[in-house]
Amino acid sequence: MKRNFPKLIALSLIFSLSVTPIANAESNSNIKAKDKKHVQVNVEDKSVPTDVRNLAQKDYLSYVTSLDKIYNKEKASYTLGEPFKIYKFNKKSDGNYYFPVLNTEGNIDYIVTISPKITKYSSSSSKYTINVSPFLSKVLNQYKDQQITILTNSKGYYVVTQNHKAKLVLKTPRLEDKKLKKTESIPTGNNVTQLKQKASVTMPTSQFKSNNYTYNEQYINKLENFKIRETQGNNGWCAGYTMSELLNATYNTNKYHAEAVMRFLHPNLQGQRFQFTGLTPREMIYFGQTQGRSPQLLNRMTTYNEVDNLTKNNKGIAVLGSRVESRNGMHAGHAMAVVGNAKLDNGQEVIIIWNSWDNGFMTQDAKNNVIPVSNGDHYRWYSSIYGY
């Protein structure tokens, strides 16, 4: 992790949907979604590998239920909507497959992300990995009975409607200290919006499944007082956000804030030097010590059992990640917080993570050290600092 980062080269992506051809399951009498005005998203291709589709259908309910329990939600029924993919402006896919998770009201509650294993970095032996988080669920719910295209770049995600204006709907941490335009024009000559097929992301593709049994069988362990009090904006303070939320949780307080943490450690920095500074592991450990904790550095990902024991003992864990796509730029190194862990009804072990860019938690296979995040990048979990 570095204090000062060179400028990150923005990668423009297009976020569009790709689905597996499937019979209109909405006609099934067992599907009772009230919503009939579906979100229509322009797509290029509706194909999804059989292995990916089967994995999503087999495991989505277990992963979703783990987050429901973390959020203290009641038992519910869910199904999958039509899946989608994310493309760059040149129409090259980012390689992931995304499945909306629908509730019985026809709204999207979560997004299932299935990624091919990154052989060079991943410790997982499986062909694909699966993660679940809220991601773009609230955004998609706002466009019922509309036809849209979704674009993304380093500034965030944009919805493009019939007027070909891209409205910013979800910000991600960005580089430039400038005000974002609420609408932007699509680049001239760009044909990403001229996609021939459409996907109905709120259309059920199978019968709804109750998570009653799954809910009762799952083991959930969480830092009792962990809450998302603030999220990261246009700065390099991921470690500050991570430590402040972990300490707020383990001390059951609201007094820690990312900016104050960064100011404590960098009292003499001003302007953009302060705004875009980061922290080293040594600085993170030092700050924990000044707050009455004894953080320890572990040069690897924590195991499921380690997370389970530390969380039970009210000791917070910071994830230290290295971006797989590029080792250069502002977010080449990134810190995240461990919220807890879960053992699913199928026996699979997962770790619950909070990324300071997000307003929700995400699941992570406990045997996979590559974490997909909400801006399309992947981070290799190479070290941990535990004891906050």
Swiss-Prot record:
GO biological process: proteolysis
Keyword Secreted assigned: yes
PROSITE patterns: THIOL_PROTEASE_HIS
Subcellular location: Secreted
Propeptide: 26-214
Keyword terms, alphabetized: Hydrolase, Protease, Secreted, Signal, Thiol protease, Virulence, Zymogen
Activity control, per UniProt: Prematurely activated/folded staphopain A is inhibited by staphostatin A (ScpB), which is probably required to protect staphylococcal cytoplasmic proteins from degradation by ScpA.
Protein name per Swiss-Prot or TrEMBL: Staphopain A
